[in-house]
A protein has these predicted regions:
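Interfacial aromatic-anchored transmembrane helix boundaries in multi-pass membrane proteins
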Residues: 30-35, 39, 72-96
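Membrane-interfacial segments
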Residues: 29, 33, 37, 61, ...
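Hydrophobic alpha-helical transmembrane segments
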Residues: 12-17, 44, 64, 68-69, ...
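Alpha-helical transmembrane segments of multipass membrane proteins
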Residues: 18-26, 30, 50-54, 78, ...
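Membrane-embedded alpha-helical hairpins and interfacial helices in multi-pass inner-membrane proteins
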Residues: 111-187
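Short helix-perturbing small/polar motifs within transmembrane alpha-helices
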Residues: 17-19, 24, 88-125, 176
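Short, charged juxtamembrane terminal tails flanking transmembrane helices
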Residues: 1-9, 183-193
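Hydrophobic transmembrane alpha-helices
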Residues: 2-68
Length: 193
């Protein structure tokens, strides 16, 4: 395992490109907002599909600070304060784990990614319903209508939130495994990392 290396400008470029890739994946998944049932699956599916972008950052930069930057930039794209705070806190944990375990330690990176995804899901999807319920419900009513809102009210609860956060953690773990295999099979063999 290589030690972390010093900051380089190309690290910023790589990190920014991976944030862009991650956000493009999320935007493609936004079609899942068509139903309240599928809306709940956006973050878990993103935790699997977007993992490769997250794992490419330390693989290419070998710098734990770039993990934090990835999480911060991801949060800023959300334009929602609870999401921003949650992603930054998750990023700090992920960066600290990478500094302690090593920037290329897959177990440490996977745990950090799981923490980041759970906090991002909590801050972005569940905080609005748990703490700003009236505002969120009115906003969804305007965007999607009464029928959508009725279904949403039936399925969103504190228990649903806990279950979904566990599902997000499991999906982030799966995303970590898939990313590790992709990195080894395609990126290492081709000499990209």
């Amino acid at each position: 395992m290589e030690e972390s290396k010093k900051f380089q400008i190309k690290d910023l470029i790589i990190t920014a490109l991976m944030v862009l890739c991650s956000q493009l994946i999320y935007r493609v998944l936004s079609f899942m907002f068509v139903s309240p049932y599928t809306m709940l699956l956006v973050v878990p599916v993103w935790a699997i599909a977007g993992a490769i972008a997250y794992f490419l950052v330390p693989a290419k930069t070998k710098n734990p600070w770039m993990i934090l930057l990835f999480c911060v930039l991801t949060s800023l794209i959300g334009f929602y304060p609870p999401y921003i705070i949650s992603c930054i806190v998750g990023g700090v944990f992920a960066m600290l784990i990478a500094k302690i375990k090593g920037a290329l330690n897959y177990k440490g990176l996977t745990v950090g990614y799981m923490i980041f995804c759970v906090l991002a899901g909590f801050g972005g999807m569940y905080v609005p319903f748990l703490f700003y319920a009236e505002q969120t419900i009115n906003s969804y009513k305007e965007m999607f209508g009464d029928k959508y809102l009725g279904m949403l009210n039936k399925i969103v609860s504190p228990m649903t939130t806990v279950i979904m956060l566990i599902i997000i953690a499991i999906c982030a773990f799966i995303g970590g495994i898939v990313s590790k295999k992709l990195l080894k099979k395609h990126f290492e063999k081709s000499g990209m990392i």
